[in-house]
Amino acid sequence: MLNNEYKNSSLKIFSLKGNEPLAQEVADRVGIELGKCSVKRFSDGEIQINIEESIRGCDVFIIQPTSNPVNLHLMELLIMIDACKRASAANINIVVPYYGYARQDRKARSREPITAKLVANLIETAGANRMIALDLHAPQIQGFFDIPIDHLMGVPIIGQHFENDPNIDPEECVVVSPDHGGVTRARKLADILKTPIAIIDKRRPKPNVAEVMNIVGEIEGRTAIIIDDIIDTAGTITLAAQALKDKGAKDVYACCTHPVLSGPAKERIENSAIKELIVTNSILLDDTRKPSNTKELSVAGLLAQAIIRVYERESVSVLFD
């Protein structure tokens, strides 16, 4: 717990159904109880939300990742924003540890939507005043909004884990980006651990299928740490791990901020060359989706600090790195 000074303040934190354990941990660290609200479903599937305490004039923070089931969690968020607006909240801040539809951030082919922008429009129209996000798949999504966005990074949390792991010697490690787009993220982790980086050149013939083509960098005899923002079906990460092993890597660790882990991901990871998978709790993982070799790190402390700084009208930029 960070402090007790916010117990009787106008700071309110609410959780929807997306990741209640994370929201509870954030509230505990801030030093307040979660706000009281009910989220129910009608028999036809419609969502009904009721805020069970006064929030008039309050600074409200709604914690909700729009993870699987994406559409249900997104609708819960939009309805809650509307409920807060109609209940006269002074400020409606949404805390989105995982932003669904972020991978649809551009037109890859003709006649395709830009759904990440559509979601931004929906959030703004519903009435949100600010968003605190964690590792957006495409940083330019911040530009889809006309409200302030605080974009936090999970890399420092992952870096701290490896720094404190007695089985890891940074001098014998190499940080690996699974594609060209992740080089900036890999460089940040490499800077923390003071290690070199490598890049995997891959081509994706069709969605959810990845082919590892070439590795750029020195791998032989080193412990390889693959870092990505999202692991979905785990095709990319497991093929990358095998390619690194084939190139002489001593051990292969994989890490990501957002463990989507859909479809065959669990089986693929458990049967792969990956020694350990390090993820954050930005997405709620049940045992049916969590590989046995998974280590989960908490982002609650980071989110709690961001919430307090926003509430106190202090700079959040110190949390960006």
Curated annotation (Swiss-Prot):
Tell me, in a sentence or two, what this protein's role is: Involved in the biosynthesis of the central metabolite phospho-alpha-D-ribosyl-1-pyrophosphate (PRPP) via the transfer of pyrophosphoryl group from ATP to 1-hydroxyl of ribose-5-phosphate (Rib-5-P).
Q: Cite the entry's keywords alphabetically.
A: ATP-binding, Cytoplasm, Kinase, Magnesium, Metal-binding, Nucleotide biosynthesis, Nucleotide-binding, Transferase
SMART domains, per database record: Pribosyltran_N
Enzyme class, spelled out: transferase
Q: Which GO terms describe its biological process?
A: 5-phosphoribose 1-diphosphate biosynthetic process; purine nucleotide biosynthetic process; ribonucleoside monophosphate biosynthetic process
Q: Name one GO molecular function term.
A: magnesium ion binding
User: What Pfam family is a match, any one?
Assistant: Pribosyl_synth
Protein family: Belongs to the ribose-phosphate pyrophosphokinase family. Class I subfamily.
- EC numbers: 2.7.6.1
Q: Which residues bind Mg(2+) 1?
A: 137
Q: Which organism is it from?
A: Staphylococcus haemolyticus (strain JCSC1435)
Cofactor note from UniProt?
Answer: Binds 2 Mg(2+) ions per subunit.
Task: List positions binding Mg(2+) 2.
Answer: 179
Q: Where are the active-site residues found?
A: 202
User: How is this protein named in the record?
Assistant: Ribose-phosphate pyrophosphokinase
- In the UniProt record, what gene is named as encoding this protein? prs
According to its UniProt record, where is this protein located? Cytoplasm
Q: Which PROSITE patterns did the record assign?
A: PRPP_SYNTHASE
Pathway listed for it is: Metabolic intermediate biosynthesis; 5-phospho-alpha-D-ribose 1-diphosphate biosynthesis; 5-phospho-alpha-D-ribose 1-diphosphate from D-ribose 5-phosphate (route I): step 1/1
Describe the protein's quaternary organization and the partners it interacts with. Homohexamer.
- Amino acids binding D-ribose 5-phosphate: 204, 228, 232-236
Residues reported in the UniProt entry to bind ATP:
44-46, 103-104
